[in-house]
């Protein structure tokens, strides 16, 4: 009998419900036992693999023969924060479907700011016909923070459209067609950025990086009348009081936010009704769960053939 797959899944939308994941993995892994922990009985000694989403701290210690952990989402901060996490490879999801969806989201919102869609939506509501001068994409400087798989793809698609694109990452990266900055060059990167797109992982080093100090360094001479931020990374990357304060005093012209420190976003949050904020419910890259389950099944099969795992997380860096 092949090594069992344990599912440890907390919360999620209907499509991410734990029972739905059991159905998917039973379908794509018909040759191995699949157990939804908390519902299904299984001998812990049989479990070789775990597919997880926001597992409770310490939950994986019950499997002494665990060989690989698969995180079902792109962000692994909730997993690596567990001090008791077994010392086995942690694999993050990196399917093409997720990358395409994130790029769609980023490109859509950069274009909406570039083409002043917020202004025209307001004009429509007020029945005002008042076109504004429109600049070319080459006149807008977009800066992408985070040059992993998602950031690289979004940056390159934006560049193909014609935007002036640069990227920043903690360690040096090279992306064809993109001006790349790293580490201590953050200030230089921010100074040439009109629209700041954040796709960083959440680590101790990046927590709270979207703050007033960062926003103060953004370009002030751009075509949009002030800098704009787009955060589709993690809620912990942003200091929300700083965002609100900077929107109110003009340090920021607008913000698009897909993630928040508390989710679901509380009904009394000022973000809901702020005229300079566009928000979405953490679904910028809501990946097809069927694609994720196939990805995990293929990784397990390759691992059992002796092939190396792909997209293994570095525990020290958190990505």
Each PLM stretch: what is its role?
Residues 89-93, 97-105, 119-120, 263-319:
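C-terminal helix-to-coil terminal segments
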Residues 172-270:
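Rossmann-like adenosine-cofactor binding region
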Residues 42-43, 59-62, 188-192, 270-271:
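Structural alpha-helical scaffold elements that stabilize or flank donor/cofactor-binding regions
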Residues 1-47:
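N-terminal glycine-/charge-rich "phosphate-binding" loop or analogous flexible N-terminal tail
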Residues 120-153:
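Glycine-rich NAD(P)-binding loop of Rossmann-like domains
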Residues 54, 73, 198-201, 233, ...:
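Glycine-rich, N-terminal phosphate-binding loop of Rossmann-like dinucleotide-binding domains
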Residues 160-177:
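NAD(P)-binding Rossmann-fold cofactor-contacting core
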Residues 48-124, 135:
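Phosphate/diphosphate ligand-binding glycine-rich loop within oxidoreductases
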């Amino acid at each position: 009998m092949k090594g069992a797959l344990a599912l440890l899944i907390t919360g999620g939308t209907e499509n991410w419900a734990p029972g739905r994941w059991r159905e998917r993995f039973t379908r794509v892994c018909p040759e191995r036992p699949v157990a939804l922990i908390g519902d299904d009985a299984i001998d812990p000694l049989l479990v070789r693999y775990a597919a997880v989403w926001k597992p409770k701290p310490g939950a994986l210690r019950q499997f002494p023969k665990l060989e690989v952990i698969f995180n079902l989402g792109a962000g692994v901060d909730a997993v690596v924060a567990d001090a008791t996490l077994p010392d086995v490879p942690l694999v993050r999801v990196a399917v093409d479907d997720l990358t395409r969806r994130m790029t769609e989201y980023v490109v859509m919102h950069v274009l909406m700011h570039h083409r002043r869609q917020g202004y025209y939506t307001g004009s429509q509501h007020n029945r005002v016909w008042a076109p504004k001068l429109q600049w070319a994409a080459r006149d807008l400087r977009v800066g992408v923070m985070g040059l992993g798989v998602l950031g690289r793809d979004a940056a390159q698609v934006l560049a193909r459209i014609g935007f002036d694109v640069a990227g920043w990452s903690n360690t040096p990266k090279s992306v064809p067609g993109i001006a790349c900055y790293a580490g201590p060059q953050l200030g230089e990167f921010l100074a040439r950025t009109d629209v700041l797109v954040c796709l960083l992982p959440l680590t101790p080093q990046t927590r709270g990086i979207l703050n007033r100090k960062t926003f103060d360094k953004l370009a002030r001479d751009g075509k949009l009348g002030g800098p704009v931020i787009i955060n589709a990374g993690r809620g912990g990357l942003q200091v929300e009081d700083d965002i609100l304060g900077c929107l109110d005093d003009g340090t920021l012209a607008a913000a698009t936010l897909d993630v928040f420190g508390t989710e679901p976003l509380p009904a009394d949050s000022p973000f809901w009704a702020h005229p300079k904020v566009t928000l979405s419910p953490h679904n910028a890259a809501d990946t097809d769960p069927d694609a994720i389950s196939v990805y995990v099944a293929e990784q397990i099969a390759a691992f059992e053939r002796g092939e190396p795992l792909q997209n293994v997380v570095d525990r020290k860096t958190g990505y």
